[in-house]
Every structure is written in structure tokens, then in C-alpha cells.
């Protein structure tokens, strides 16, 4: 182990590699995933306590991790507030406030010191940024550097002991409650309109008078369906719909949507026609990769003048296709299905970019500038009685700034978003760096705790906190607030801010309801837990 003591950088990457390898091991369908890196770091440092990874590494990793999450979630987070977001976040904040109060009462009952209690709390709610905020707050409480060094391993040890039950307990609660409530995930997704279905293009002949707006671009609002008209055939000539195009009797519309939505549209408009919508016509379609920064971060409705003679019908982001609407905002790395004349396809392709190489050369300035701004926001302190100070820290600051910038999308020439693939890579790298570095600070103390009977008390109290939070959210969300169970379970995963729980729920439901719930509460839950952990620390220290 001497080689790792003398070479911290080597130790860092070996810990990361070992942890990621262990994280891929599945036992009955469950794996620790990237969280295994934390335990790898603890294990290495338990064997050789002199292994030290520089403090800056975990700060850097944590900041990158939360910033990339905020950028990806920002637009959806603020959009959801216009519909269900307020109700869902009210449940999340109520649950976290309740569990914070219960935790403080439990910790006081067993006479647990504030530093260990705060670490236990962050492990029970599985939030590493909150644990980092606790460590960051220690100097404002103890002042003396030697005292800080003496106690800084305590929250990490308590976190490590409570963390496994924090994950497994929530997963068990979700699975058991699903059986208890007899949830039909297929029917639930269908009722909520989020069943994962393929998109098709079909021809519909207009034989009925359209009630409401007869503008083609308004058809999804007029009919209340997630569809888009990609072409209009009139008197044997096919054209692309424009902002002023209207639906006439006898028109043949090429419509994109799910099979069910297309059947509903045909019932209202007229008759569904057989055949290939593209056969024998001058219009063509193609999937094109978005790498032109000038087109991202702007709703399609505002891009329409630049897209004259072009129609975007579908947007594929990650592994899912979405019907393009006027409100859709493109991101770098999206794959769009466009319809245009044959002879324009070359220029259309050039307009969108269609270049993986160009995408890899994205401007780093907005990324580092946003991170710098986030760290500055995280440094803002709110004084508390007794001389302590509350702050968002290196996790909360970047997250708040990223949420705002992710919702804004772009400022003039600067595109705040990063390509989807790059975002996922940054997120994975950031959390891996953080967990590897933070794990090594607790090794010696963790080894000693394994032979300490008090560790069982920490694990038991952590389990009580985890299960109380899980059952409260599932019962109140599903039974009282009538939120679909899959979405409620996704909200619980978001409140726990743990991707492993989301993966489990998504695999169980096989639809997008968990992702909707997760995205709606994750950012606010992250910030709330960063603050709650410090409240526990200050209340009991």
C-alpha cells in the first residue's frame, strides 16, 4: 500500500476503477452502481489510513456532478411548476421537514453528537452533497483546525453505515407498497398518457369539418392530441405546412403520433388511408444530428423563420422519441427527423450541423463560467445564532445556478447547455471523483466503528428514518394526493436523490412516470437536504 500513500493520483484512479467494477456486480437484480466507489475508498483507507486524496478533488467532483444535473433538469423543473410541480414539491418539502424534525428528536433521545447525527441523517436520506455540506460547515462551528481534523471523519463514518439501508430500505418499501396497493403499471401509464409507444406517420383524408382553429400548426391543441402534421397533399401536390396553412375538406394530411393518437385523429378528421406517405413524392425525410449551436436553447416557434421550407416532426433525446411541438427546445446532441424537398436535404443537413466532431468542440467557457458563478453563490453565508453560518456550499450553489441556466438555455451567443452525452459523462466523472476522494477520509474511523456496538444503533436509527420517509411519501402521495404510484415512487427516488432507486422503479414500471416524478422534485430536494443536514448539525452541536 506504500505506493498509494506516495502517489495519491494513482490511488485515486485505482479506487475509482475498483469501485466502478464492484458497482457493476448485481445480486438479485440490485447493484450499488457508482456508490460502490465510496465503499472502495473507505476500504482502501481502512487498510492503509495514510492514503490521502487532496481535498480539492472531492470539491471539484461534487461541483461538476451537481452542476451537470442542474443543467439537464432546469428546463423541465421550471416547466413542471406550471402544472403539477407545486403540488409535488410541496409533498417533498413537507416530507423532508417532517423527517428532519423526527431525526433531531431521535438523535436527542439516544444522545448522539451533532457531527455524527448529521452524517447519519445524510446517509439515511442518501445524499452525498448534503454530507459534503456538513463537512464544509465544521470550520464555522469548531474554528480550530486540529479540532476540525479530529471530527471530520465522524459524519463520513455515520454516512457509510446508514447509506446501504438508505438505498435498500427505500427499494423494499416501493416494492412492498406496490404489491400492497395492487398497482397495474401498464394501466396506470396508459391512464396518465405516458405509456412508452412508438411513433408512426400515417395519412388521414379530411372528410369532417374541424371544430375550432383550422390552422395546421394548431391541430395538436385543437384536437387535444400529441400529433403533428408533417405534410399536406392537396390536388395531388404535397407541401409542407406553414404558419398560415389551413385544413380544407379533401386534404390528405401526413400525421405523426402514436398509433392510438393517430386513430383518434382519424376519427375526428376523416379516414385513415393505407400506403407509404412518402411514396412517389418530391418530399424527403431524414434524421439529422444537431450540432449547430445557433439552433439550440430556442423554442421551435421562434426558429420558424430560419426553418422555412423545413418541418421537424420528431426529436430523439437519449433513447426516447418525442413529437416536436412549437414549445420544443432543441439541445446539442439531439437527433431530429426533418421533412423537406429532395433538393434541399443537403442544405438542411448543413443547417443543423450533423457533425459529431463539431459537437465535441463545444465551447467550454459557459461551462466553467457557470461553475464559477455557482461556487460564488455557494459561498454566500447566512449567519445563525451562536456564530455559525448556513450556506449552500460547493453542492447547492452550483446546483441552483445550473437550474437557472439550464432553464434559460442560452444568453446571446453563449449556450449554457452541454451536449447530452457530454453531460452524462461529466456527471459520472464528477460523482466518481467525489466518492473516491471523500471515502478515503473515513477509512481508519470506519474500521474502528465495525467493532463498536454503537454502530448497530446508527444503522437501526438510519433504517427508521429511511423507512418513515419512504412510507410517508408513498402513502400520502398515492392515497391522499392521488398521484399515480409510478410517479410517486419516482418522486421518492428524487427525494432520496438516488439514481439506483430510480433505476429500480423504472425497471418495475417500464414507463416514464418515475422519471417525471424524479425530475419534478430532485433539484429542490437536493437543496432542501443540503440545508436540512446543516440544521441537524447546528441543532445538536
Swiss-Prot record:
Keyword line: Cell membrane, Membrane, Repeat, Transmembrane, Transmembrane helix, Transport
PROSITE patterns registered for this protein in UniProt: RCK_C (PS51202)
One Gene Ontology cellular component annotation held by this UniProt entry: plasma membrane
Pfam families, alphabetized: Asp-Al_Ex, TrkA_C
Location in or out of the cell: Cell membrane
Gene Ontology BP annotations: potassium ion transport
Transmembrane segments: 4-23, 30-47, 57-79, 91-113, 156-178, 362-384, 389-411, 424-446, 456-478, 516-538
The keyword NAD is annotated on this UniProt entry: no
Membrane topology type: Multi-pass membrane protein
RCK C-terminal domain segment(s): 187-271, 273-354
One Gene Ontology term of the molecular function aspect: monoatomic cation transmembrane transporter activity
InterPro entries reported in the protein's UniProt record: AAE_transporter, RCK_C, RCK_C_sf, YidE_YbjL
UniProt family annotation: Belongs to the AAE transporter (TC 2.A.81) family.
Designated name of the protein: Uncharacterized transporter DIP0830
